[in-house]
Amino acid sequence: MRKKHFLFASVLALLCGSSTLYAQDFKLTSSGYFKNQGVDVMAFDDIYPEGHQGGVCIIMNGHRVATNGDIRLEATPGQWQPVPKQLDRKLGDNSITATLCYPDSSRHLTGFNPMIYPDLHLIYTVNVESKGKNIEVTVDLDRPIPQEFIGKVGFTLEFFPGSLFGKPWIMDGQSGIFPQQPNSPLMTTQPNYLHTGNYHDGKQSLADMDKLIGKGYSPIVADDIISEPYAKGRKFTSRPDDPYNKVTIESLSGDLQLFDGRMNHNNGWFVLRSNIKPGVTKGAVKWIITPNVVADWMYQPVIQTSQIGYHPAQDKEAVIEMDIPDNRKETAQIIRIDAHAEKVVNNVTPANWGK
């Protein structure tokens, strides 16, 4: 989610660049996200948590590593589980503070993707702040978590599984690999639908809860049988073997747990989670996130052509997207590829275009 430069050239080329220098600490940009060279951290900039998009999001060297850092009501939520409603988002000097709440009554048992919201009323703030090379996440609640939801309400961060299969992780002194196939033992928990809230006046047409729940496995419920955590501890490192994807998370407020969300959802991700303790409000969650920063990393130029084609009389122009600090002014080549060989048919000097 970085601002980009563009070059513009006839038929196949354009470049763009800037002499912008990066600080060695995370800084809040004018676009509303944190940046430290090739690492970007977003916070509540987009809202689609059921699609693994929203909350605190970590992008490292062009790849989205983790996302959906937020309060959730299940250890491994899927696309049918309750999501919070975002009330506000404010930018500070070097911080982002979002205010959210449960329930979102407009989604309770209604709509194309009905969700079952429990009888839990909660307003909370998530403050995300740059602390040098670290990102500090602090969650404050407006009230303690009710006893019946202790162990269910927690802060989660989801890791994209596709790039982690067979790769290592470390939790305190324990190490392991992210498995390609979920293999954790199972455990049972009390499902939240046993404490369903009443958020409608009886005039709306609501989904049939009995049909949603069913008699066997139901992804609408999905919190009665879940995976046991692969590990518990206070400090977790994903991909310690790879400087381009290594990220360390330390919890100052309670244990971290690593879950496999694919056990009860076919589109689940790996989930790092901290449960919220009984009786706490201020500082209910405090995480220190430390992504590894590779000095002077830049992404490779990306050639963009028209997605709808070109008119026969139109100049065929393309855009070469460059990373912000990439100020190279190289010649672009147009290459014809056939069954026999490749041949350079033209050399183009790109023109600056865009930011």
What are these regions (language model features)?
Residues 1-9:
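Bacterial N-terminal signal peptides that target proteins for export
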Residues 9-18:
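Bacterial N-terminal signal peptides
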Residues 23-95, 112, 190-219, 223-226:
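Beta-strand-rich N-terminal accessory domains
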Residues 73-144:
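Extended, loop-rich substrate-binding clefts of extracytoplasmic carbohydrate-active enzymes
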Residues 136-185:
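Acidic (Asp/Glu-rich), glycine- and aromatic
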Residues 212, 216-297:
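Beta-strand-rich recognition/accessory modules
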Residues 271, 276-284, 291, 324-326, ...:
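Extended acidic/polar, glycine-enriched regions
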Residues 300-328:
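Contiguous beta-strand segments within globular domains
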